Design a protein with these regions (language model features):
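Helix-coil-helix junctions within alpha-helical repeat/solenoid scaffolds
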Residues: 4-266
Length: 266
């Protein structure tokens, strides 16, 4: 039943955000026909995952709330917990980081009690990102270290590049003195994404690395890295990642011409 959502997430990773969105919307529309069924909670959860991939906070929260409501009605404890994780991430990204982190941590503990193994590196990466939003990189970095261990133990590598990128982000947030280690994390994320042909994650890694390089005065190198990666995309230009890439490229060009300062680290 959820094959379309798995396909949609693959399309997103490969760089086809609009096609992924259409697949996901079609699957959700089919699932919503007729009376609500227990499996509809799972469908809404997958919709939340896809929205989170797109960094669509509003859609993530709405789908997470639908997941929680349906899973509660049908007694799906693990889906309730997963819904709380996604809802917490959305809250953290919207500015209520303390509430979001607490909700995610509670949901993560509940998921662990179920013994569910799938998506654990992904969830830990979301939790680490939320800790970063809360200004607690020192709490987020152990989550990412655990995610790395799980990736190696389970070979669940689809979010590996993002785990490495977020390590770099949180290292810089913790201390500017960690710049060399952060740069290595961004480069590793870029290398992993390229090996996997994960264009969406390659773009994120390039964004972070390009931002760091321009901070170090390497604006030409930053532009040379990011421009061809951005230029590959043919859709998804309304997504946060592509909009940030466009803004960074424009700022790099403007900065070279004596324009305003560059945007903050993605």
């Amino acid at each position: 039943m959820h094959h379309s959502f798995y396909g949609a997430m693959v399309l997103w990773v490969l760089g086809y955000a609009d096609q992924a969105q259409h697949w996901g919307q079609d699957e959700l529309a089919r699932a919503q026909q007729g009376e609500p069924t227990p499996s509809l909670a799972s469908t809404h959860l997958f919709a939340a995952l896809l929205a989170q991939h797109r960094r669509d906070v509003v859609a993530t929260r709405a789908a997470a709330e639908a997941t929680i409501a349906l899973a509660t009605t049908h007694g799906f404890a693990h889906r309730v917990a997963q819904g709380h994780i996604m809802q917490g991430w959305a809250l953290a990204m919207r500015g209520d980081a303390a509430t979001g982190v607490a909700q995610m941590a509670q949901g993560w503990e509940a998921v662990q009690r179920t013994g569910l193994q799938l998506y654990r590196p992904y969830v830990l990466a979301l939790l680490a990102e939320a800790y970063g939003q809360a200004g607690q990189p020192e709490a987020g970095l152990p989550c990412l270290a655990e995610a790395v261990t799980l990736v190696e133990a389970t070979e669940e590598r689809w979010w590996e590049a993002e785990v490495s990128r977020l390590q770099g982000v949180l290292l810089l947030q913790r201390s500017p003195a960690d710049v060399d280690q952060a740069e290595a994390c961004f480069q590793q994320a870029l290398d992993v994404a390229r090996r996997q042909q994960a264009r969406a994650l390659e773009l994120r890694a390039a964004l972070s690395l390009s931002w760091l390089w321009q901070q170090q005065g390497q604006r030409a190198e930053a532009h040379a890295l990011l421009a061809p990666i951005y230029g590959w995309f043919t859709e998804g230009f309304d997504t946060a990642d592509l909009q940030e890439a466009q803004a960074l490229l424009e700022a790099l060009r403007a900065r070279d011409a004596g324009g305003p300062a560059l945007p903050p680290l993605p």
